[in-house]
Amino acid sequence: MNHREIAVAISNDNQEVSVTETIDAIKNAGFKNVFIQWYNKDWNPSQEEQLKYVREQGLNVIFAHLGYQNINDLWLENENGENLVPRYINDLKICKENNIPMVVMHLTSKSVAPIYNEIGIKRLQKIVDYAESLDIQVAFENTKTKGYLEYVMDHIHNKNAGICFDSGHYHVYFDDELDFSKFKDRIFAVHLHDNDKSGDLHLIPFDGTLNWANIINNLKDNGYQGPVTIELCYRYDYLKDGINNFYKKGYEAAYKLQELFEKE
């Protein structure tokens, strides 16, 4: 049997360690696949340097998570909203140059966002069409507010457009409510992490209150074929154990999720 790949986020939000130490710990834990944050922020080392280091370590980049600065303006008739299109097109161009086959995008930020509308769809259509011309998949993520994924997937029909299912957001913001069947065969990516509903904690799976068997069954039943991708953040009580133990524990949790995927 071919096992699903296991992957992990390279987080720039980890505490008390550099991103280089994060990458080293990820490799030491046994991960071979990662996703990177391409947020166009003033990081040291920069996102370009991080990508170079990741590749030097022999790690495979499965997708880039694009930034979401001003993303609520996507739905507004203003200059910030218009500027999102060339920004994302430039990100896609860079991903193509670096052989990154998929990007993940948010559709909103914060708890209140402008209601979805045709203005945003027209902009997203340009972004998705350009990605399609580069043979790049675009996966839109469920964030804090319901309805956006359904609206976008109902209006954008390109084969390269799908969703990224985020388990933590599903638990704390969606109260475990999502009609997975609406996205059948369009689930391109996942962000698997846990919380106890007190916040978006990015805990290691099984350290919170998510029903993992239910989530994995929903993903399997609706055609998700991709890696077991966990999105962890090194902070809180995890700091006592050290970065290497954190990612080793994360790898073990991902392996348990892999076993759930393979269970008949």
Locate each region found by the language model.
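Active-site acidic/histidine proton-transfer and metal-coordination neighborhood
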Residues: 75-162, 172
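Hydrophobic faces of well-ordered beta-strands that scaffold small-molecule active sites
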Residues: 4-10, 34-36, 61-66, 103-105, ...
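A structural motif corresponding to the C-terminal end of an alpha-helix
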Residues: 29, 94-99, 127-138, 218-225, ...
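Charged helix-capping and loop-helix junction motifs
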Residues: 46-51, 81-88, 117-125, 176-179, ...
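Short, histidine-centered active-site or binding-site loop motifs used for metal coordination
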Residues: 68-70, 107-109, 194-196, 234
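N-terminal pre-domain/capping segments
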Residues: 1-90, 96, 150, 158, ...
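Acidic-and-aromatic substrate-binding clefts and catalytic sites of carbohydrate-active enzymes
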Residues: 11-18, 36-49, 71-74, 79, ...
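Histidine-acidic metal/acid-base catalytic patches
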Residues: 1-7, 16-27, 55, 146-164, ...
